[in-house]
Amino acid sequence: MIEWKIFVLIFLTFHMKKLLAQEIPLDDSPKMFDDQYKGCRDKMDKVVPGILKSEMQSNKEFKDSWEKASQSWKLIKPTMKLPKNFQNEHGIAVIAYTGNIYEAFNKATRDVGASSKNYKNKYRFKAMHYYLTMAVDLLGNKKRSTLVYRGVKSIHFVPSNSSGRVIRFGQFTSSSEDIKVAKNFGTASFFKMQTRYGANIMKFSKYPNEKEVLIPGYELFKVQLFKKQTHEFTLVSTGKTKNLFNCAYFKALLDK
């Protein structure tokens, strides 16, 4: 009986280590919803208020998060210097993301995969994604790079051999200007990055001490250095973007 328990313990330990050591490749074409809305932003501005209303009615978690963020936005907006064309909904979307909704939002964004049908029929954050994309685009300073860090627990990322050591995250990705803050989130994989498209959202955040910079999933990075033993990356923005989807909402209307 003791020998059997020892065998089971060894077996479980071995497989747990394999699971924890699982490596996930990063490349330049992750299958996630990553629309930049190029060429259709004016059209989206007209239809997205209706989309937002519908999604709030059908998604209580999102409704509660959006309404709470809306109240916070009313308080902090007068204290902020905002870029031209920055709408209330942009600010609300950023605040909502820094709250508790980001987990459900990111999971839904990943679950779309590369499927237009999934986006059309299952994605419940169409309005949130649009407003957040516009907010990050307006808040970002593309003329200069910002040094940020990102720590991840439980996942070992590696650069894919198929993408020429150029990668992107595919979804909105949080990072920090403070290396200590980033390491508090994990060190299973660790990123040191120079971002050109990331937006400093510290003043919007529920946790301003985290000095958060939000990186859009479409930004391309060159892997300058990767340490396999520690899964540490040094990434430099290429200054370019790439996305699988564009103007997906209007293309979905044409699909039957």
What spans do the regions from the language model cover?
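Processing junctions and N-termini across compartments
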Residues: 15, 34, 143, 147-152, ...
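ADP-ribosyltransferase catalytic core
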Residues: 163-245
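C-terminal helix/juxtamembrane-tail motif
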Residues: 106-114, 238-256
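Internal glycine-rich, Lys/Arg-flanked active-site/core loops of soluble domains
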Residues: 42, 46-195, 199
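Short N-terminal segments immediately surrounding and downstream of signal-peptide cleavage
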Residues: 22-43
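Cleavable N-terminal signal peptides of Sec/SRP-targeted secreted and luminal proteins
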Residues: 3-21
